[in-house]
Amino acid sequence: NPPSGEVITANNKIIPDDYPYLITNDWAEPYRITRITDLLENVQKHSLLTFAQIQLDQTSLMAQEFLPYLLELTPETSLERSALAELLSWDGTMDRNKAAPLIFSAWYRELAKLIYSDELGETFEDYYGFRPLFVSSVLANETKTKWCDDTRTPAEESCEFVESKAFKEAIVYLSNTYGSDISKWQWGTAHYAHSDHAILTDTPLGRFFDIKIPNGGDAFTVNAARFGIGNDEPFTQTNGPGYRALYDLSNLDNSLFIHTTGQSGNPLSGHYQDFAETWRDGRYIPMTMKREDIEKGKMGTLTLNP
């Protein structure tokens, strides 16, 4: 019961450096916990609505941190100029309907590869990931580090060179994958929440029952939507908040919840995926607590016999 009245966790480090016992060395970066804290402290009196807004927040502090490096680049083609124009007015919100999150994520994917693939060699694929604290340290301390230099070439590459090369390669990748019309680029086209069927996923029928829905967010937004930049589909969402709930402890009947996909695991049921868009769009359903209300709203009874 801390004096602040706040209990917050986002897989972040929750212990001081001198804590005597090992819990883990694999803490999440501080972006999400920082954003949650800011959103909590910016409102004097919260409600279910303001807590819902926190749960659904898609502002990436990680993107905001790295965006200035992108905006310093000089574009050389019309497509590069159009891409940078998208980023100039972008605030780091990972909106599924916008091109900027896709451009940024593609650039960062190439940037990480260029910074440390040469040093790691054959082991690179095992460690290919965001690692934003490391990458940020490299870019901020160029005079003290050689990570930006490509050890496979005789020249000594600067971080500015690597940032620019990553941007060019990202634009080529995006144009080859999504076409050269930036107005048709959308984050959700590449970044979709993918839910496999629990049983059928490894069968020939599995792909017919997968649930795929365009989604916003990234690994560093409060509304987490992690993806693996080293994967074959580098922007496909691999995990996120499978269940959201808002509990009103003064009146539990006001509580709300939602989870991904649907209540049924039967692909032929109308409730197999009827929650998917509700979940994605940040809507909730009532958490019915009273037995009489549950009976009124039930759609059937499933009886399990031994």
Protein language model regions, located:
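Active-site acid/base region of carbohydrate-active enzymes
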Residues: 82
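Cationic-aromatic interfacial patches
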Residues: 85
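C-terminal/peripheral segments of proteins
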Residues: 1-72, 76-79, 89-306
